[in-house]
Amino acid sequence: MKKNKIFISIASYRDSELIPTIENCIKNAKLPHNLVFGISRQYHPDDKFDDLSKYKKDKRFKIIESLWNKSIGVCHARHEIQKLYNDEEFYFQLDSHHRFIKDWDTKIKKTFRSLIKKNHKKPIISSYLPSYDPDTKSKDEDKLNDVWRTYIDRFMPEGPIFIFPESIEDKQAEPEPARFLSGHFIFANGSFVNEVPYDPKL
């Protein structure tokens, strides 16, 4: 096991926020040398906003690139990214549009380890996260610090459950048990990759 290393899985489909997300992730990490990025970039040749050329010589980056019209979907992309995992201690799955608090890496590891000490053998930290303004000028700054839970809003006519986030008014310091997982934010032990692999056909 590669102790303290975080494997960060990001599937991106022509997302102009991919580069800002990577930059913000590294900038706000306390220990950026412990980050390992697995990225699936699904792109159009005319797009320049998500060009990863500057990261290709960085040993922390493992990049899969495919044309937009060859995309099979996010589950397939995440399945391919999981093949890049190499025994890092932690697995962190994100969408390609995020912002990070200062020292996010040490803080989330501390929270994760505190859950293990409380006899949660394989905790998974997951949530819908507050939205943000790409220019970092939020119209409602308070929402950036909201703690959200995920709940069932309704069953859709096609059958699937429509899951929706809601703010937790009592901003407790510890995570609360949850029934659902949000694919755009999953922090777990690295063994998650092998124990709960993505089905590429979903």
Question: Which residue stretches match the model-derived regions?
Answer:
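Catalytic cores of eukaryotic secretory-pathway lumenal/extracellular enzymes that build
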Residues: 1-202
